[in-house]
Amino acid sequence: MSLLYYSRIRFILKLTPLLLCSQNPSGAHVTSIFAGTVEDAIDAKNLPIGPPPPEKYGVTSVRTHVSFMKTHFFEALAEQHAGNISFIHVFPGLVDGPTFYNDANPLWFRVLWRVAKVMMSWYMTSPQVCGEVMVLLGTGRYPAKGVAVGGDDVAFSSTRERGGGAYAVDQRGDEKKQVSYEKLRQSDTRDRVWKHTMGVLNGIQGMTG
């Protein structure tokens, strides 16, 4: 989880002074590739703020916690840096690449993948399309919050504000049709995510000097 969330937030915060120097009319663009728009079922009484408990730690639980916190933290950053920086969390989908055929994978997997690929081709994203989407994310379709925008091609943010500065998008660069985590949002959710994240990062910095 440290590589999927905490270290990425740390990079963003440390690079912010350079990002603020951007002359891009739509602002600088920060793109985090993981699970944008993937919203797992969540207990409203137990919001996934912080890492999952050890007994529940796994691929799905980590995704749940990372996606939830990243959405709210990006919204906070978009507010702080309105007019200057855009924050995008993208789900790239299943991208057909050389990793699946790497000799480091077991032979059975490489054989099985060649069969599975045929059945999953309708769902997969080609490397070319994936690359085109990543380039698109750096354009004015996803501007910093408050940047003067016009036209229906400007994306809606995770709060369903057109050009809102914090975006959760899928493998085609499309946003959700409703507010992210709409039924789970509380008045202090964003603040709780912020305090937790900064507490962890400040604690680590204190340990390392």
Functional labels for PLM-detected ranges:
Residues L3-G27, E75-E79:
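Amphipathic alpha-helical dimer-interface segment in Rossmann-like NAD(P)H-dependent oxidoreductases
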Residues L4-Y5, F34-T37, F91-L94:
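Short, flexible loop/turn elements at secondary-structure junctions
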Residues K45-G209:
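NAD(P)H-dependent oxidoreductase Rossmann-fold/reductase module
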Residues L19-D43, A82-I85:
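Active-site loop of short-chain dehydrogenase/reductase
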